[in-house]
């Protein structure tokens, strides 16, 4: 399935049905009074969050959606049938913006949440409404209301408790595959991860959701590489796990580059709690590990944890620390 997190679609409510011009007809009654019924209300357009969905792919190829029109009024004071509302399901984490993307109309953060974005048009009045002492046989009726229409922008921000960040090939996908049942594509070259991957981590009787974000490179917040497109998916998370490739010649530069991209993208990311991990320690000597940890701790003023996603050394400790950090923020 394609991962689609940005779409623009057209939506329109159903028009109201027209009122009816009709007169009562009955045997032995030549001139019955007006009995034209009202038009039915048009259907509304409603968005609903659905936890079974994780992409906006349903809106990639079909981009025009219109609710059902109300039926016209009928004789014998019968109202037209109301049009069916159109319910459009979206993943949790979907945001609805105006066409230009400047106005947030709604943000879905829980399952089975509904938002009526367009009301259907009101039905027109039948001629029975216009009978008066001076006009016993009115031929007046009103037309149904034309419903609102608009283009909107849908943007999906994945909901996760923990975000995995780091340079391409830092070992994020391997980390995710070990701590969850997720099966991300893994290979020994940069940009293996082309879309965000989500997984659920179970710790005893507790759990949390973790997201592997495609690797960041210098200039990601300006659209370079893949990071700019996916940085938004970790804005909602509580904790960042920052993996650094221990085999790199300059771990401090790698750390600073990723931090700059996070800080340049938004203040939300800048202020996230960060767990720093020096990965691939299985290919380093004890002296090399300590030297690189010392360098990182000097510039970060934070504890740096040595791990190996190849041997899984130290990974369980990070998982428990992440869970503890999440719980402390609740």
From Swiss-Prot:
It comes from the Bacteria. Mg(2+) binds at residues 173, 193. GTP binds at residues 166-173, 191-195, 212-215, 279-282, 308-310. GO terms for biological process: ribosome biogenesis. Its EC number is 3.6.5.-. GO terms for cellular component: cytoplasm. It is found in: Cytoplasm. Its main location: cytoplasm. Residues 160-327 form the OBG-type G domain. Its cofactor is Mg(2+). Keywords: Cytoplasm, GTP-binding, Hydrolase, Magnesium, Metal-binding, Nucleotide-binding. Transmembrane segments: none annotated. Residues 1-159 form the Obg domain. Pfam families: GTP1_OBG, MMR_HSR1. SUPFAM superfamilies: Obg GTP-binding protein N-terminal domain, P-loop containing nucleoside triphosphate hydrolases. One of its GO terms (molecular function) is GTPase activity. Monomer. Belongs to the TRAFAC class OBG-HflX-like GTPase superfamily. OBG GTPase family. An essential GTPase which binds GTP, GDP and possibly (p)ppGpp with moderate affinity, with high nucleotide exchange rates and a fairly low GTP hydrolysis rate. Plays a role in control of the cell cycle, stress response, ribosome biogenesis and in those bacteria that undergo differentiation, in morphogenesis control. This is GTPase Obg. It comes from Rickettsia massiliae (strain Mtu5). The gene is obg.
């Amino acid at each position: 399935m394609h991962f689609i997190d940005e779409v623009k679609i057209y939506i329109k409510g159903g028009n109201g049905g027209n009122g009816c011009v009709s007169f009562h007809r009955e045997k032995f009654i030549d001139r019955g009074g007006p009995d034209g019924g009202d038009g039915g209300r048009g259907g509304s357009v409603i968005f609903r969050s659905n936890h079974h969905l994780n992409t906006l792919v349903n809106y990639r190829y079909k981009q025009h959606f219109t609710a059902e029109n109300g039926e016209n009024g009928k004789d014998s004071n019968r109202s037209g049938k109301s049009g069916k509302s159109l319910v459009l399901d979206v993943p949790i984490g979907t945001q609805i913006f105006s066409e230009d993307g400047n106005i947030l109309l709604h943000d879905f953060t829980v399952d089975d949440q509904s938002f009526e974005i367009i009301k259907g048009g009101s039905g027109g009045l039948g001629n029975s409404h216009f009978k008066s002492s001076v006009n016993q046989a009115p031929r007046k009726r009103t037309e149904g209301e034309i419903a609102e229409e608009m283009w909107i922008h849908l943007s999906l921000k994945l909901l996760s408790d923990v975000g995995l960040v780091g340079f391409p090939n830092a070992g994020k996908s391997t980390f995710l595959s070990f701590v969850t049942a997720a099966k991300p594509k893994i290979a020994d070259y940069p940009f293996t991860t082309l879309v965000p991957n989500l997984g659920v981590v179970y710790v005893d009787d507790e759990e949390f959701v973790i997201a592997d974000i495609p690797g960041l490179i210098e200039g990601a917040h300006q659209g370079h590489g893949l990071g700019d497109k996916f940085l938004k998916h970790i804005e909602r998370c509580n904790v960042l796990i920052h993996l650094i490739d221990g085999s790199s010649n300059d771990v401090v530069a790698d750390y600073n580059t990723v931090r700059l991209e996070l800080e340049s993208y938004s203040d939300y990311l800048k202020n996230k709690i960060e767990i720093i991990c020096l990965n691939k320690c299985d290919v380093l000597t004890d002296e090399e590990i300590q030297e690189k940890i010392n360098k990182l701790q000097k510039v970060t003023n934070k504890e740096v944890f040595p791990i190996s996603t190849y041997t899984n050394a130290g990974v369980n400790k990070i998982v428990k620390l992440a869970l503890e950090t999440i719980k402390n923020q609740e």
